[in-house]
């Protein structure tokens, strides 16, 4: 199977970036092309790492430099347009994919020609991949994905593999919505006639830390979330009760201290895990 990886790069520790790339090079079915979007100028250390891989793996890496920082959604669209294959796997530059992740996703696309997007569960870790602190569980079947998407993202963004042309056919792909590009795209897709599913396995290890909670409780983040769900309500994807729920929880999140947010996030929004299964 010929397939792509689409990565967006701005700020990252070089070591994390290397771990992420290596996890994709170890896939049981190798990618045909890895597209790295440089979203604005990078540090010399990161440039060095990217150049090393581009020289080492001739023809595998395609580097897309953007003159200025466009933000996640628009940068990913640029990368998507440059991908030469129809099937594209998303990956964050500090996360680790398990070796069979893409093979299992490719099998689903072979089984079901109408499938447009396939995600997986994630395990979140602190410091080392062995230190799993939580998992984010999402629904498996299309109809449950549509329902779940009324309030929350029904896919784990860093795990998805999708059909490039289906994404771009859905109102031009990613939109420029601050930190909520994933839920915005996915809910538009599954409500717009594109078929989705999630695999019932954690196939990506996601790096987490206290900064993630600080970002989630920023007013810009809360406002953006409310705006996206308001748009879903106007479109008829979400109900009024969903919008009210999101407004109350996002304002609560903004007001709540970080320690409380961390407890709620792990107990309610995610399932807590202490060891890797």
Name these PLM-found stretches.
Residues 4-26:
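Short, well-formed alpha-helical segments that are part of the catalytic scaffolds
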Residues 21-65:
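Acidic donor-binding segment of Leloir-type glycosyltransferases
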Residues 66-83, 104:
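Glycine-rich, basic loop-to-helix element that forms the pyrophosphate-binding segment
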Residues 88:
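Short aromatic/hydrophobic "clamp" motif used to bind/position activated sugar donors
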Residues 100-133:
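Conserved donor NDP-sugar-binding/catalytic core segment of glycosyltransferases
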Residues 120-121, 135-153:
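Short, flexible, basic/aromatic active-site loop/helix in glycosyltransferases
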Residues 178-185:
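Acidic donor-binding loop at a coil-to-helix junction in glycosyltransferase catalytic cores
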Residues 202, 206, 214-238:
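Catalytic core of nucleotide-sugar-dependent glycosyltransferases
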